[in-house]
Structures are given as structure tokens and as C-alpha cells.
Regions:
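Gly/Ser-rich "nucleophile elbow"/oxyanion-hole loop immediately N-terminal to the catalytic nucleophile
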Residues: 1-29, 39-45, 89
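Short beta-strand immediately N-terminal to the catalytic nucleophile in serine-hydrolase-like folds
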Residues: 24-26, 49-51, 98
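Hydrolases whose catalytic domains are alpha/beta-hydrolase-1, hotdog thioesterase
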Residues: 33-37
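Mobile cap/lid helix-loop segments that gate and shape the active-site cleft of serine hydrolases
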Residues: 43-93
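Catalytic His-Asp charge-relay segment
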Residues: 92-99, 124-125
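Acidic catalytic loop of the alpha/beta-hydrolase fold
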Residues: 101-107, 133
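Alpha/beta-hydrolase-fold serine-hydrolase catalytic core, especially in secreted/extracellular enzymes
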Residues: 114, 118-258
Length: 258
């Protein structure tokens, strides 16, 4: 992913690029990279298009059909890369998948569709008739038409709703929210936010001890003393929040020691 961002930054120095209309796309190994980039950096793309490739470790590699099974600590570390466990982040990034009809790597699209469905998302899946590990010409047209519609709208940089899943502070930001501390690393952390009528912000957390709000980007237009609710607790507007003894409080700065 570092190579991707370095290449993108370099391209921006040579071409006029609209940062609100950048798609992440790839096929085969590029399809695997696309799923990874799409879920872990969902807030920077206007859309994602993955073809074939893989989206997780265990099923794709048929890991548990062999003995001995990987130790639990190794399985936890799959959460650094696996796209399936963070499929809910695609609430922030519309995605479309492609598979050849007889390509065994259709498995990646199928399992992403399964995990996205658990998050209330539906994955459009274009299947190339009679195709193995390659694109069908008609499928290209169908995908391009879908992308043109999404790209025309542009990226929503200031969403009123955020659904953010992570397992590590390596991927700790989604739009105007940043997770600064976890109760237990490599376990699922969830930070969901809803701005209601521009005047109230409701936040729910799981496995999080600290987080920050970018008030310049958050579409909240209120400084009411109790316009923010965190896990049912009413609090004044602030940039940083910390959880201690089960209760949330505002703080002046973040402490990444958590």
C-alpha cells in the first residue's frame, strides 16, 4: 500500500487529479490489493472495483484442511490484511466486483459479498459469461457504466454517517474520526457515528479507549453543551475523548500509549 500512495503522490505532481474522483481498481493480484486498499482506506476512494484475486487468508488458502492448524496468535494477525473482517468500512466506499464465470478466484467476490451482507451492504457482482481468469468485453462496459454513475457524484468527504471497523491502530482513521487507543489490539474495534439534523452527534464504540473528532470536517453545526452522545453518555463538544473506568470524558490531547 505504501507503493500505491507513493505512486499516487508522484502522479499528482504531473497530472491534474481530482482527489474526490479517484477509484481503486485491480484484477487478480491487483484484485487482492484492491480489496485491501478499499476496506482499510475507504475514505480516500470514490469507488472500488476488484476482479478475482483473494480477500482473506483462511478460506482462500484452505488453511484448516491441513495439520497442524496455525497458532491463534498467527490467526489474529491475519486481521492486519484480511478485507472480510473490515467489510463494513465499504459503507464509505461503493464497490463492484468482477469474476469470470469459470474462474476459481470468484471465491474472493463471493466471500466479500457474504461479509458485506452481514454489514447490511450488497455487492454488485458482474460475471463474465464463459470466462476463466480474464475479463469479458461486455462486462467491462457494464462495470464502466456503473463506475461513471458513482464517480459523477464524487466522494463524500464529510459524511453524516460513519461505520468504521479496525483491528489495529495502523488503520485508525476514517474521514473525521480517528481511533487513538484500543482496549485490546487485534480484536475487533468499532466506531460508529451519526450526525442528526446537523445538530447532534451520536457515537457508539466497541473495544476503544480513546478517539478524536476532526471538528473542521465533521458536519456538526452545534456547540450545545450536550450535542454529543457517546455510548449513551451526553458530553460537551470536544476534539478528543478518553474512556476511564467505563465512562467517557473529553481531554485536551491524545495519548497513544493505550
Amino acid at each position: 500500500e505504501v507503493d500505491t500512495f507513493e505512486a499516487l503522490d508522484h502522479a499528482k505532481t504531473h497530472y491534474p487529479i481530482d482527489e474526490d474522483r479517484i477509484c481503486v481498481r485491480g484484477f487478480s493480484m491487483g484484485g487482492a490489493a484492491t480489496w485491501h486498499q478499499a476496506v482499510h482506506h475507504a475514505d480516500i476512494w470514490v469507488a472500488a472495483n476488484a476482479g478475482a484475486g483473494f480477500a482473506e487468508t483462511a478460506v482462500y488458502q484452505n488453511v484448516f484442511s491441513k495439520e497442524p492448524h496455525p497458532p491463534t496468535w498467527e490467526q489474529k494477525l491475519w486481521n492486519l490484511y484480511d478485507a472480510t473482517v473490515c467489510a463494513g468500512n465499504l459503507h464509505q466506499c461503493p464497490a463492484i466486483a468482477y469474476s469470470g464465470e469459470i474462474d476459481k478466484q470468484m471465491q474472493a467476490s463471493d466471500i466479500m459479498a457474504e461479509f458485506m451482507a452481514k454489514e447490511g451492504l450488497e455487492l454488485p457482482h458482474v460475471i463474465g459469461p464463459g470466462m476463466g481468469h480474464k475479463f469479458h468485453p461486455d462486462s467491462k462496459i457494464e462495470i464502466e457504466d456503473w463506475l461513471k454513475t458513482v464517480v459523477a457524484k464524487g466522494r463524500n468527504k464529510n459524511p453524516e454517517q460513519i461505520r468504521f471497523t479496525t483491528y489495529t491502530l495502523r488503520y485508525n482513521r476514517m474521514h473525521w474520526l480517528t481511533i487513538d487507543g484500543l482496549e485490546e489490539h487485534w480484536q475487533r474495534a468499532q466506531l460508529d457515528a451519526d450526525v442528526i439534523d446537523k445538530s447532534k452527534l451520536q457515537i457508539t464504540t466497541q473495544n476503544i479507549t480513546r478517539f478524536s473528532i476532526d471538528l473542521q470536517q465533521c458536519p456538526l453545526n452545534s456547540d450545545n453543551e450536550e450535542s454529543i452522545t457517546i455510548d449513551g453518555q451526553h458530553l460537551a463538544v470536544s476534539t478528543h475523548y478518553v474512556k476511564s473506568n467505563g465512562a467517557w470524558a473529553s481531554c485536551t490531547e491524545t495519548d497513544n500509549s493505550s
